[in-house]
Amino acid sequence: MPIQVLPPQLANQIAAGEVVERPASVVKELVENSLDAGATRIDIDIERGGAKLIRIRDNGCGIKKDELALALARHATSKIASLDDLEAIISLGFRGEALASISSVSRLTLTSRTAEQQEAWQAYAEGRDMDVTVKPAAHPVGTTLEVLDLFYNTPARRKFLRTEKTEFNHIDEIIRRIALARFDVTINLSHNGKIVRQYRAVPEGGQKERRLGAICGTAFLEQALAIEWQHGDLTLRGWVADPNHTTPALAEIQYCYVNGRMMRDRLINHAIRQACEDKLGADQQPAFVLYLEIDPHQVDVNVHPAKHEVRFHQSRLVHDFIYQGVLSVLQQQLETPLPLDDEPQPAPRAIPENRVAAGRNHFAEPAVREPVAPLYTPAPASGSRPAAPWPNAQPGYQKQQGEVYRQLLQTPAPMQKPKAPEPQEPALAANSQSFGRVLTIVHSDCALLELDGNISLLALPVAERWLRQAQLTPGEAPVCAQPLLIPLRLKVSGEEKSALEKAQSALAELGIDFQSDAQHVTIRAVPLPLRQQNLQILIPELIGYLAKQSVFEPGNIAQWIARNLMSEHAQWSMAQAITLLADVERLCPQLVKTPPGGLLQSVDLHPAIKALKDE
């Protein structure tokens, strides 16, 4: 066969083999494009796990009509223009091949409008030569990308897709990672017409712990130690779970970001593992959410087809910097910025600048680790023993770890380069309905809140009851039923059996499935909020309530169930309160605008302030 130039569609399909692994890969590429466009809100609609439809809609800057055809062409991008740009990448995308690759294995439609244009335009590519057609459309400022029938023309690739649930779980995980990277962006995820995730933008200076708790869970939030570690152009922020309380479930939380880009980096994982090795068992893994900021000239992100890995020009420096940052927090036992219990919190301590790991000129000189005397000994916190001084040398570790570490550090010596000016990112506004910031827990079940300088008290059990009612109230589709491992069989009277039969359709909408015979009823499934309840008590009470009713409305039954559920928490913690309020704000936004009686009470501090001033 003679050498020949491949047709554009075939070339794009070959490239898609690296870029488009599964529906989650498409979602990642398209959402990253939205973030690069300055979007502050991204709506993601998925159908059948992404095999049928992936729709990404944003409010970014949009694409000009004249550039729509180029947007679907290979190696066409607005992110870089020269080799110098490639050596200091600050955007998430830069290769200009994602849209072309995706359009070659799906039916892709791109609709966009810029603020300068009066109308929107729609583009799609088709045919062997991937000719682009552009036509007028209706669309607000921003961009919408629709990907239909993924892998429809490559049956072999489609055959390797997993079940709908598995593919959507991969998409969900990608969105979780992106939501942790950009707290300033609102992200909504829907599957088969149902909203699954709603991550509201966190205002500047707001509580990032709300989104952290929603994604990583309350258990991680309660054990999280905050990190703020800096030297020169290296900055490490985020949270690491206390290794003394790490569980197998927590160990699955390992999120790392380099200059805002999600990564799976062996060097970073090794540094964190080494810092925690004295407190972790041989089969345990650390849990962390960490953000590393580094001079873009000192990291190469163009080393992996899906951009999951990076290469640091000074691996030893980065490794030691992260190691020292995590180790210092574990030694000091710094607590998360939000107090997670009702005890008085010690005064905040100044976080020192790392001078042991960094050397003098950490980018221009080779990273040679010299013994350095400890320059700082952390002051003991109130009520705790003094923290150990900085270590002069790294502790020993296993031979296999050392071999991996040695291989990771075999990188060429860097060349001296001028520092690139830090990019000025446009401020992204984020407005959301909120009860405010949780200050502390009062009397075990009330949260003291602050919003715009106003103080209020919120009853957590009441908020929990409203949340349960929202979770139980069916919308356009019935509430999802959770099958019981051991069905519950109860004896009922004739009157109760008759009431159950009349209420069967209403109960089915609430996710309660049962079968009845002559004198018994067998509960086979209940909705998720009921799974942790004592059904031996709750279900007979529910049957008794139904026997007294003549009309069976799902909303009324959901309200009764919500009022009779036992609270999950006898003693509320800060983390639990933050998680609850985040869920209430997401599912019950009407409560924020018009709080019902018994939920929220304003607290007037003016008399107390006046009394203090009078003194």
UniProtKB/Swiss-Prot annotation:
SUPFAM superfamilies: ATPase domain of HSP90 chaperone/DNA topoisomerase II/histidine kinase (SSF55874), DNA mismatch repair protein MutL (SSF118116), Ribosomal protein S5 domain 2-like (SSF54211). Gene3D superfamilies: 3.30.230.10, Histidine kinase-like ATPase, C-terminal domain, MutL, C-terminal domain, dimerisation subdomain, MutL, C-terminal domain, regulatory subdomain. Residues 378-391 have a biased composition (Low complexity). Keywords: DNA damage, DNA repair. GO terms for biological process: mismatch repair. Residues 378-397 are annotated as: Disordered. InterPro entries: DNA_mismatch_repair_CS (IPR014762), DNA_mismatch_repair_MutL (IPR020667), DNA_mismatch_S5_2-like (IPR013507), HATPase_C_sf (IPR036890), MutL/Mlh/PMS (IPR002099), MutL/Mlh/Pms-like (IPR038973), MutL_C (IPR014790), MutL_C_dimsub (IPR042120). One of its GO terms (cellular component) is mismatch repair complex. GO terms for molecular function: ATP binding; ATP hydrolysis activity; ATP-dependent DNA damage sensor activity; mismatched DNA binding. HAMAP family: DNA_mis_repair. Belongs to the DNA mismatch repair MutL/HexB family. This protein is involved in the repair of mismatches in DNA. It is required for dam-dependent methyl-directed DNA mismatch repair. May act as a 'molecular matchmaker', a protein that promotes the formation of a stable complex between two or more DNA-binding proteins in an ATP-dependent manner without itself being part of a final effector complex. This is DNA mismatch repair protein MutL.
